[in-house]
C-alpha cells in the first residue's frame, strides 16, 4: 500500500484524476487530499480517499506569472499540502506527496517502497537534476512536486521556512533543501519525477532521446521511467514549458502496444 497525498481543486481536478488513475494502475493507494468544495464533493465517492476540506477556492491562483496577488493566493493554497502530509504521517507513518500534474508510467521500485516504510529514513526527495547549479541556487536543489516525509521535525522546519518568504527562500523548494540539512534523506534517481527542466539546457536536451519503448514499457535510458511531471489537462495562464515532453510521452504511449498506456493517453486527450 502506498500512502499518497496531494492537493485537488476544481481547476486541477482533471489532472489529479489522471494522477490517481495512472498510479492505481500499478499500486494499491490510500489518499489524503487537501480539497476545495468541488474536489471534496467528487472525491468523497472514493473509499480510498481521505478528504481534508482546507481550501475555499482556487480562483485567482497562479505561480507562473508576475502577478503578486495570484502568487500569494497560490502559495496559500499550496501550503495546505503540509496539512495533508502531516495527517498521513500521523495515521500511516509517512506521507508521499504528488503534485496533481504527475503521470505514472511504471510502478515505484520495490526498494523505494521499502525505504518509504523505513523508520530510519526521514525523507525521500527528488533533486531537480538540471545540471545548472546557478539556477538551482535560486530555485532550490529539490523539486517539491514529489517528496515523502516521515520526520515531523523536518516537516515543521519545512513549513516554517516556506511560510516566511521574507527570509529569502524560494517558496517550499529551497526551503526543503535547508530543512534536509539536519536529516537523513534518500534522493530518488533520475527516472522519478521526470520534468521538463531536466531537458532544458543545451547539454541536457539530448536526454530526451533516452526516452524510448522497450518491451512495451517507457524507459529512461536503462531505467523504467516511473513518473513524469508535466501539465496535461489544466488550463494555464502561462506558457506550458513541458509541452515538448508531453508530446514525447504521448508519442511513446501511442506506439507502446501497452493497454495501460493507451488508457492514460486517452485520458490526457480528454477521451472517455
Residue positions per predicted region:
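N-terminal anchoring/stem segment of glycosyltransferases
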Residues: 1-67, 90-92, 245-272
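Short, solvent-exposed loop/turn segments at secondary-structure junctions
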Residues: 11-12, 38-40, 57-59, 102-104, ...
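Amphipathic alpha-helical segments that form well-ordered structural scaffolds
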Residues: 18, 22, 26, 84, ...
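Short, hydrophobic beta-strand segments that form beta-sheet elements in well-ordered domains
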Residues: 30-37, 123-126, 228
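Extracytoplasmic beta-rich repeat domains
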Residues: 73-74
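GT-A fold catalytic core of metal-dependent nucleotide-sugar glycosyltransferases
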Residues: 77-131
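A recurrent flexible, glycine/aromatic-enriched loop bordering the glycosyltransferase active site
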Residues: 133-146
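Catalytic core and acceptor-binding pocket of nucleotide-sugar-dependent glycosyltransferases
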Residues: 144-240
